[in-house]
Amino acid sequence: MANAAASHVAEQDDVHNGAVFHPATVVFSPALAMAQAMGASGKALLTASVAGYEVGIRVGEFLGRSHYKVFHTTGTAGTIAAAAAVGHLLGLNPTQ
C-alpha cells in the first residue's frame, strides 16, 4: 500500500495517449512489493515492469477511447498490467 501511495503522491502521472492509460502507478507498485518480498534483482524488477507496461498498453489500446468514456482505463487495464508484472516476477507463463 505504501508503494501505491508513493507512486501517486505528486500527481505527476505518466500517460500513454493511445491507451489512455497511466502505467507506472499500477505496474511499479505491485512489482516493487513483490520484488522486495522475493529478494529479486533490479534487473528482474525492470523486466517485469516492462512486461506490465507492454500488456497494459496493449490492453488499453484494444479497449480504445470509447472505453474511457465509461471506465478509467488505468483501473481496468491496470489490473491486468499489474498481474502481468507480478506474474513475470513469479515466473508464471501466459497461461497461468
Which stretches of residues belong to each language-model region?
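N-terminal core-entry segment
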Residues: 1-96
